[in-house]
Amino acid sequence: MPPKKQQQPAGSSKKADQKKKEKIIEDKTFGLKNKKGAKQQKFFKAVTHLVKFGQQYPRQAAQTESEKKLKKEDKKKELQELNELFKPVVAAQKISKGADPKSVVCAFFKQGQCTKGDKCKFSHDLSLERKCEKRSVYIDARDEDLEKDTMDNWDEKKLEEVVNKKHGEAEKKKPKTQIVCKYFLDAIENNKYGWFWVCPGGGDNCMYRHALPPGFVLKKDKKKEEKQDEISLEDLIEKERAALGPNVTKITLECFIAWKRRKRQEKIDKAEQDMERRKADFKAGKALVISGREVFEFRPELVDADDEEADDTRYTQGTGEDDEVEDPVCVNDVDLSLYVPKAVDETGITVASPERFSTYASIEKDDNKLSEASGGEINSSEQNDLEDRDGDEELENGVMDAVPVDENLFTGEDLDELEEELNTLDLEE
């Protein structure tokens, strides 16, 4: 008889069936999964449904899926109830190497299952977690350990170890420094410093200090202070004005004009000095970079000079007196009388120009003409002014310009004929 086939476990058969179904779906719907057409997507869904659920209707498949979800939720609820009734087994507690076990609260004591009592190496103080202090960046923990590690707690081996470390050759070669470790600073600046941070420069054996000196300010704190210290331009000006004090020279028109003239003269003198210095450097051959204008200013004879390869054109330097201007341009000279400096009143009131009276008089004349044109009455003073003006015009012309009027131009008969013509006239559009 042939040997019997070994029965496979149920879990493995389910996984194999699931893989077979996925393989069939991939073969039958090859290239259709990512198609955008509605027909292709409908066909893809139908094939996957048939392979997974057989000839079941979609409603039945949805019901089975919902039933499975409900079963999973029921199992979770049962586990929670069992955990509440019977406390679960707590995993063995682990701590990092070198850490003090008394600084960690016992996990079994939290669940009320610790039976060791005082012999337990972990702490049974639940408030210990809230008492943990923040690690200070201004204190090196190694210094505190050295202060607490006194000779009263040493034995012979510890004493020999300390002597060898303190007076050994390796310790003598090792330089003593107060420089702060760069890895320590980088960790603080980048917010990476914490309880589990280890110095990449050697850990606890790092020769540099892992503590900030007193008064040290980090870069991120400096930026915050700079932002807070920024003030507006107006506040800065007022602050500087207040710092001057009362014993200062008051700015008036006279002192301002004197200051302006002095500054202008200083500017002119400085320009002349620079020109003389550059001219001397040019003559001495020290000037390496000069402009073409400066060359002709320093040596005017170069204007009439001619090179060997130049053409026969001769350039003349005009004086400006005999030159003829074909297109005359109207030039208005600047009247300096218009720019007379005036002191401003301290109360802030602006000084009006004297021309306002002439403009006001011209406005009054225009108003009088407007009232005459509209048929308004004229005052006696205005009438006298008009008569005087008319008399002046007559005297200037010598002869009074008058237009003769024909009184018999339009008689009654002419007006009657005009009305008849208007009545009998046919108007065309």
Curated annotation (Swiss-Prot):
It is found in: Cytoplasm; Nucleus. One of its GO terms (molecular function) is zinc ion binding. One of its GO terms (cellular component) is nucleus. SMART domains: ZnF_C3H1 (SM00356). Residues 384-396 have a biased composition (Acidic residues). Residues 1-28, 56-75, 301-327, 362-415 are annotated as: Disordered. Residues 14-28, 65-75 have a biased composition (Basic and acidic residues). One of its GO terms (biological process) is cytoplasmic translation. InterPro entries: ZC3H15/TMA46_C, Znf_CCCH, Znf_CCCH_sf. Residues 1-11 have a biased composition (Polar residues). Keywords: Coiled coil, Cytoplasm, Metal-binding, Nucleus, Repeat, Zinc, Zinc-finger. SUPFAM superfamilies: CCCH zinc finger (SSF90229). Residues 237-261 are annotated as: Required for interaction with DRG1. A zinc finger (C3H1-type) spans 100-127, 175-213. Residues 59-87, 219-285 form a coiled coil. Protects DRG1 from proteolytic degradation. Interacts with DRG1. Belongs to the ZC3H15/TMA46 family. This is Zinc finger CCCH domain-containing protein 15. The gene is ZC3H15.
